Amino acid sequence: MPHAAGRPASPAQTSGEELANSLTHGLGVGLSIAGLVVMVVAAARHGTARDVVGAAIFGSMLILLYLMSTLYHALRGPKVKLVFKVFDHSAIFLLIAGTYTPFCLSSLGRTRPAWGWTIFGLVWGLAVLGITFKGVFYGRIAKSTLRPPPLDHLHPPIVTPVNPAFVRRMGWISTLIYLAMGWLIVVPILAGLVGGVPVGEILPPRGLYWLFGGGLIYSLGALVYSLEKVRYHHALWHLFVVGGSACHVFAVLFHVIPGKVGP
């Protein structure tokens, strides 16, 4: 999905790299606002209230993710940086859940409503779990890294360092939550096949191409994200994230909202 999960902090980036990081996801903010407007208008014209709600939630979560990421990279100072890092990583969970929402309410809602509401509840529950986890994890980091000034030279503050094993363990937990959320979409598809419901009745083939194409672009971006020794790798990864989001917007706009037919 949009971010790599639970990795230790990357080496410090230059001011030029952070500017590029801010600009690339600032672009995402603008495109997300446009996507929200277009999806909601299309849903209002061609769909039902359920389609409007799904499109609005998805578009809003896109804006939230890109806005938090832009601010995180643009702001300076360790305290505010850590706060917005929590917001940034929490927004990932919200975007995953938000991306599921129109598919749960509209695509599955029209063909497999029980599955639609089940996946909807599970994915948003996992999002809440993930956000809680991130808050606790980074709260622990803050206590260790944001050291208060000593009271005097005889009574320095007592700070417990974070165990590297703890960081790795929390990283694995975070990764498992992301993976569980990302792969939930396979469950109703397989259940539909077992139950005799063709996948095409849930989502047209071209819609599936956009859906899984977006996931593939996100995954390729994760590989770019891992190239920490390459300058501006983070900004390049941001462009992959924007591309993955665009694919999912096209899937919703042209193949989830009723009456819309497109590429």
Annotate each predicted stretch with a short phrase.
Residues 1-263:
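Multi-pass alpha-helical transmembrane bundles in non-GPCR membrane proteins
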